[in-house]
Amino acid sequence: MSKVYNWFNERLEIQSIADDVTSKYVPPHVNIFYCLGGITLTCFLVQVATGFAMTFYYRPTVTEAFASVQYIMTEVNFGWLIRSVHRWSASMMVLMMILHVFRVYLTGGFKKPRELTWVTGVILSVITVSFGVTGYSLPWDQVGYWAVKIVTGVPDAIPVIGGFVVELLRGSVGVGQPTLTRFYSLHTFVLPLLAAVFMLMHFLMIRKQGISGPL
């Protein structure tokens, strides 16, 4: 194993990267509340893993979505556990994200020179909520259907462009197959990609600037 490691280390300088990661200075005022962002990331990774597993069985059509979710829960080996963990970690992710935002705000972590870190964090918060809205509709049961109908109908109150925004969200005038397709695409591809990009930016800025000092 040492020969293999040395071979890679000569070409990629793995050891220097590992030393840089493990030797980063941690201020003495840091406590467990500074771990909330990391816990949020962990929940996101659990979401990715369990969500990916369910894509093998879920069918994003208005006629088969609900039945496919039932199939996952009752027929797929450990399907009930995978979906339950997905739901629990989703709730935990939202909770940890809210607590993380409060911690950063209360400790002044948004102040100069960390304004852009705060901005990317706010964007990630919006993405997290969007995950919840789009994921809620995917079982396409009564709760999911009416939730989508209400949420996508809210922009209708906007003057001039309201109708256009509603149709853009739904994919048609009413809520139906185009709506489910769009929400599925957002939930499984667009939002995870955006989350990954902004998380990378968020972490790189934290890495560069370090953790903010005490108030």
UniProtKB/Swiss-Prot annotation:
Heme c binds at residue 35. It is a multi-pass membrane protein. Heme b 2 binds at residues 86, 187. The keyword Transmembrane applies. Belongs to the cytochrome b family. PetB subfamily. GO terms for molecular function: electron transporter, transferring electrons within cytochrome b6/f complex of photosystem II activity; metal ion binding; oxidoreductase activity. It is found in: Plastid, Chloroplast thylakoid membrane. It comes from Ostreococcus tauri. The keyword Translocase does not apply. InterPro entries: Cyt_b/b6_N, Cyt_B6_PetB, Cytb/b6-like_sf, Cytochrome_b_N_euk/bac, Di-haem_cyt_TM. The chain crosses the membrane at residues 32-52, 90-110, 116-136, 186-206. This is Cytochrome b6. Its cofactor is heme b; heme c. GO terms for cellular component: chloroplast thylakoid membrane. Component of the cytochrome b6-f complex, which mediates electron transfer between photosystem II (PSII) and photosystem I (PSI), cyclic electron flow around PSI, and state transitions. PROSITE patterns: CYTB_NTER. Binds 2 heme b groups non-covalently with two histidine residues as axial ligands. Binds one heme group covalently by a single cysteine link with no axial amino acid ligand. This heme was named heme ci. It holds the Pfam family Cytochrome_B. It comes from the Eukaryota. Heme 1 (or BH or b566) is high-potential and absorbs at about 566 nm, and heme 2 (or BL or b562) is low-potential and absorbs at about 562 nm. Heme b 1 binds at residues 100, 202. The 4 large subunits of the cytochrome b6-f complex are cytochrome b6, subunit IV (17 kDa polypeptide, PetD), cytochrome f and the Rieske protein, while the 4 small subunits are PetG, PetL, PetM and PetN. The complex functions as a dimer. GO terms for biological process: photosynthesis; respiratory electron transport chain. Keywords: Chloroplast, Electron transport, Heme, Iron, Membrane, Metal-binding, Photosynthesis, Plastid, Thylakoid, Transmembrane, Transmembrane helix, Transport.
